[in-house]
Amino acid sequence: EVTKPETINYRTLKPEMDGLFCERIFGPAKDWECHCGKYKRVRHRGIVCERCGVEVTESRVRRHRMGYIKLAAPVTHVWYLKGIPSYISILLDMPLRDVEQIVYFNSYVVLDPGNHPELQTKQLLTEDQSMELEDQIYAEDSTLEGIEVGIGAEALERLLQDLELEQDAERLREEINSAKGQKRAKLIKRLRVVDNFVATGSH
């Protein structure tokens, strides 16, 4: 995990530890040499230095090794949003246009309709509709409760967390058996994505 915003030390010109160019995370800056210089040369290949924690290997590993940054708030990865097909819109079974409206803070989305008679989960609301709903909820004579509305990547995260992928996969298989034509093709596409997520065990 990258925990510091530093890149290179201006005096030593070496990458800062735990920074954006960290050798412990991404690999050595020089071939077959650890950060502190205890191990140099090919004969120490594969050794992890006990002082600095850097693996003695080729510097080219830095081109493909990846670290991660813990963000203060959720963000939507553009590959899963804009890629073809858009995995987020397929998983949520929502049109890509609607998903983009939520991500770019143009529309609110209903996360939980509570006991509201007209709201549905995943229904989009404009800012005016959202404010109107807020007024209804906080009115003195209101009986509305349990209603949740969100916007941005945080709302998408919540919708994705609420998915029951195994149950969805079973339901999709049943629907595919009776569906035909374009609808069947769409269901198969969604089932493929759901099955892939279930197979990774990351749900």
Swiss-Prot record:
InterPro entries: DNA-dir_RpoC_beta_prime, RNA_pol_Rpb1_1, RNA_pol_Rpb1_clamp_domain. This is DNA-directed RNA polymerase subunit gamma. The keyword Metal-binding applies. One of its GO terms (biological process) is DNA-templated transcription. Its cofactor is Zn(2+). Its EC number is 2.7.7.6. DNA-dependent RNA polymerase catalyzes the transcription of DNA into RNA using the four ribonucleoside triphosphates as substrates. It is an enzyme of class 2 (transferase). Keywords: DNA-directed RNA polymerase, Metal-binding, Nucleotidyltransferase, Transcription, Transferase, Zinc. One of its GO terms (cellular component) is DNA-directed RNA polymerase complex. The gene is rpoC1. It catalyses: RNA(n) + a ribonucleoside 5'-triphosphate = RNA(n+1) + diphosphate. It comes from Prochlorothrix hollandica. One of its GO terms (molecular function) is metal ion binding. In cyanobacteria the RNAP catalytic core is composed of 2 alpha, 1 beta, 1 beta', 1 gamma and 1 omega subunit. When a sigma factor is associated with the core the holoenzyme is formed, which can initiate transcription. The lineage of its organism: Bacteria, Bacillati, Cyanobacteriota, Cyanophyceae, Prochlorotrichales. Belongs to the RNA polymerase beta' chain family. RpoC1 subfamily. Zn(2+) binds at C34, C36, C49, C52. Binds 1 Zn(2+) ion per subunit.
